[in-house]
Regions:
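Non-catalytic positions within long, well-ordered alpha-helices that form the structural scaffold/packing
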Residues: 35-36, 167
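Active-site pocket-lining/capping segments in soluble small-molecule metabolic enzymes
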Residues: 2-25, 44, 48-173, 179-235
Length: 235
């Protein structure tokens, strides 16, 4: 919310201001703009950047950087995607979520568990099938004579194995999705990540990702599968 950001910077100059990922700051020139005009101290980078791009931005960034570490994977350029607004009539930038809780509805039917967003069917799950949070980009749709995830399958971002590289790049904080998640989810993920970061800081040279960490995080992963997302892309 640019108006709130401007008001806070003008009226409370000592208030620590963090730029949301919805600010879509993908380069250091953008970060410099927000730093010079609003005095931000930290920014959350979008999930579309590769690790090399994160390192390049961090090298010249005038503010602290925070990156996504675990949670729902987004393949869109955050802050610039309005796909869900065609169903909800609200921008994710102003309501804070692609699928506002008030628009989400689950319905058990004779042919499966249906997920609806503002009453529009976006997926149907068979008994025993893992169900992801209903977002339009991860819905299953009929294209031609086939029904499948036309844009993206439900998958969770898990970068625990990148802790050494992220610290080396100078990243100050990792972001774990907690909004619209259960307390049990948050407790499990935060506990595992706390252990991993502490172990790395104790002995960086001998850091290895533990099998138990992967198993614990897999239990709460969307779609029961994880990925490093854009961090390891080559283009």
């Amino acid at each position: 919310d640019m108006a709130v950001l401007d008001y806070a910077a003008e009226q409370y100059p000592e208030l620590p201001l963090h730029l949301s990922v919805q600010g879509s700051a993908t380069n250091y020139e953008t970060l410099k703009f927000y730093k010079n005009n609003f005095g931000i101290r930290r920014a959350v980078l979008p999930r579309v950047l590769s690790l090399k791009q994160v390192e390049a931005v961090a090298q010249y960034s005038p503010v602290e950087l925070e990156v996504f570490a675990f949670g729902s994977l987004c393949i869109m350029a955050e802050g610039r995607c309005y796909l869900s607004s065609y169903l909800t009539d609200e921008s994710p930038n102003t309501c804070g979520a692609c699928s506002p809780a008030k628009d989400v509805r689950w319905e058990q039917t004779e042919i499966g568990l249906e997920a609806r967003l503002n009453d529009v069917l976006i997926d149907r799950f068979e008994e025993g099938e893992n169900a992801g949070y209903p977002t339009l980009c991860k819905g299953r749709f009929k294209v031609g004579d086939k029904t499948f995830h036309a844009i993206e399958e439900p998958t969770s971002l898990n970068t625990v194995e990148l802790i050494p590289q992220l610290q080396a790049a100078g990243i100050k904080a990792v972001k774990i999705e907690g909004r619209q998640r259960s307390p049990a989810y948050v407790e499990n993920v935060v506990r595992t990540w706390r252990r991993a970061i502490d172990l790395y800081n104790m002995n960086p040279e001998h850091f290895r990702v533990k099998k138990q960490w992967k198993e614990d995080l897999a239990k709460v992963s969307e779609g029961a599968q994880t990925t490093l997302g854009a961090y390891t892309r080559s283009w």
